[in-house]
Amino acid sequence: MKRSSLLKAMTAALTAAVVFTSAPAAAIAECTQFWIPAQYTANGSRYVARDEDGAYRNFKTYGIEPSMDNVEYYSHETNFTWTSDKTSYRYSFVRDPKDQWDDGPNAYSAAGINEKGVSCSATLSTDYNDAAKAADPLNGESGIGEYNYASIVLGESATAREGVELIGKLVETYGACSCDQLTISDPNESWVLMVLSGHQWAAVKLPADKASVNPNMSNLRFAA
């Protein structure tokens, strides 16, 4: 696709996304992911982004998580816990305010970037059908979920691929409490990781010749 054609297509797609994200909360309460590869941007940068569509305003806190030994990650969604066996990487974070999570010290991290240049944005909520649910149900008691994805990726991963493999391993081992998509990037590549069911996941390296806007198509809800 020629650059001008792609820009026209992206303008239309982004306009549609604005319509979705400007809709009342009753109409949609999920997220929207964006991907624009380097060859389609004026400055040669890749853009991986996500907005939260669950409310008109989503207040966030910004900060730096220091490097620490043997970090214990735990969730306020479930009873999930996992302890690292190494020294974590220092990273910046965008988190929910603590008072939204019972004043826990490790409130849900929506995005961030670590000292190795690995970034993560989590999540876009998805769903599974009845057949998948019967075969591999979600682990709502102790499964990993969006509360921990970004913190674990940023604290433990030196590359995007390493982050993908780590989250995949944790999903297989502990199960997941929800179906989600998250993006993980480093200076060389970007990935979308999809948690499909209780213990199944898939990941795709985002292509250099295609752009996308994903308005949570599998989970859209419309007002009557």
Each language-model region and where it sits:
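Intrinsically disordered and other compositionally biased segments
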Residues: A12-T15, V19, Q181-L182
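C-terminal segment of classical bacterial N-terminal signal peptides
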Residues: A17-A27
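Bacterial N-terminal signal peptides that target proteins for export
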Residues: K2-A13
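N-terminal leader/propeptide and maturation segments of large enzyme subunits in energy/redox metabolism
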Residues: I144-A160, E165-L166
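Hydrophobic transmembrane signal anchors and adjacent membrane-proximal interface regions, especially
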Residues: V18, Y91, I152-L154, A202
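A contiguous strand-loop segment
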Residues: E30-E146, L166-A224
